[in-house]
A protein has these predicted regions:
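Class I SAM-dependent methyltransferase Rossmann-like catalytic core
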Residues: 146-180
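A short, conserved alpha-helix within the catalytic core of class I
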Residues: 268-279
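Class I SAM-dependent methyltransferase SAM/SAH-binding core
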Residues: 199-237
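Conserved Nudix-box catalytic region and its N-terminal flanking loop in Nudix hydrolases
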Residues: 26-65
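Conserved beta-strand signature within the Rossmann-like core of class I S-adenosyl-L-methionine
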Residues: 288-296
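Active-site-adjacent beta-strand/loop module that shapes the phosphate/pyrophosphate-binding cleft
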Residues: 74-110
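Acidic, metal-coordinating catalytic segment for phosphate/diphosphate chemistry
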Residues: 1-21
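Nudix hydrolase/Nudix homology domain
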Residues: 97-143
Length: 341
């Protein structure tokens, strides 16, 4: 069956979309296919009543059909009420309900060839179109896409964890994020880059206090509305939370921080090295500061690089990484750190 869609570069109106098909990509550019009962497939599903397709359906469908969690979404085609888009992310290992099918990762060219050979030339064409869109994404569009999807989802959250992009309760949150503090061994200042509603700032202060370490928290986020939310939640630190882009933000008063935490997916994959260099040069305290680097979707057992592996591949000396400790639940993806000179 041939698929004939109209190329698009923006989100269709909500009432125009009833079905979505998504092409998943890993941060390294490989395409992910699902091995289903009927053969190779792509995540696809209906928009349910009451769902916002941009927030709800694009999250639910790849989790339910592929066990894949997206961090970035971009539409590229529309056929009537059927939307085609690509997502970038990784296989999911967290607390949300999700499938655990067999996944195959390959270059987009190889993925399209496998689909064609499996008798699905229609899906092969979808993968090729997605790859063209994925290759041409520029930095400005990447950040705009992040704002239009994550900002709305976080602001709609009913719990502090929801408002920080996490799909579990406070106990799951601690299990998934507490390990970040393993790299904090002394009192000092802490900057959370991509702080959202400020929950990680708040949590790190409390968790370190359990070990007798006093941390003074600070935060930045790309979304000004999330910055305002964090300031409302944490009025005692309102003057320490700023709006800014992780790739080029510098402290307004020129200060440096003893600990700086960054997420690799704050920037496009090809800018990760620039992200690390910028913060080592501009936000981490010289001569003893530490840059903590996380990639929450990393899974070395499945071949998705950990933060430490990514740092080494980019040419940085990794001074250590977290172990996850002894908390119950699935082990979190380890945080790694680089020490300043």
């Amino acid at each position: 069956m041939a698929i004939r869609f109209t190329p698009i570069r923006s989100d269709p109106p909500a009432d125009q979309v009833r079905t979505i098909t998504l092409v998943p990509f890993l941060p390294d550019g490989r395409c992910v296919l699902v091995q289903g009962q009927a053969g190779l497939a792509l995540p696809s599903g209906e928009v349910r009543d009451g769902e916002d397709y941009l927030i709800d359906t694009v999250l639910r469908v790849p989790l339910e059909t592929a066990g894949f969690r997206y961090q970035h979404f971009r539409p590229f085609g529309l056929d009537g009420d059927h939307l085609y888009g690509w997502i970038e992310g990784a296989p999911y290992t967290g607390w949300r309900p999700h499938a655990e099918p067999e996944l195959t990762a390959a270059s987009a060219e190889d993925a399209a060839a496998r689909l064609r050979d499996a008798g699905r030339p229609d899906l092969a064409a979808v993968v090729r179109a997605a790859a063209r869109s994925h290759r041409t994404l520029d930095d400005q569009t990447y950040y705009a896409d992040s704002l239009r999807t994550l900002e709305r989802a976080y602001l709609r959250g009913r719990t502090p964890q929801d408002g920080s992009g996490f799909g579990g309760d406070e106990h799951a949150w601690r299990q998934a994020r507490h390990h970040i503090t393993e790299g904090m061994t002394t009192a000092g200042t802490f900057l959370d880059v991509g702080c959202a509603n400020g929950l990680l700032m708040e949590s790190v202060v409390a968790w370190c206090a359990e070990r007798g370490l006093r941390l003074e928290p600070f935060g930045i986020d790309l979304a000004s509305s999330l910055v305002e939310l964090a300031r409302r939640r944490l009025p005692q630190w309102a003057d320490r939370i700023w709006a800014g882009n992780a790739i080029d933000w510098t402290p307004p008063d020129g200060r440096r921080f003893d600990y700086v935490h960054v997420l690799l997916d704050c920037v496009p994959t090809h800018r990760r090295g620039d992200l690390i260099r910028h913060h080592l040069a501009g936000t981490v305290s010289e001569g003893g500061g530490r840059l903590l680097v996380s990639d929450y979707s990393a899974d070395s057992a499945r071949g998705w690089p950990t933060a430490a592996q990514t740092l080494r591949a980019l040419g940085f000396a990794c001074a250590g990484e977290s172990t996850g400790g002894s908390l119950p639940g699935p082990p979190p993806a380890p945080t790694a750190w680089v020490d300043s000179c």
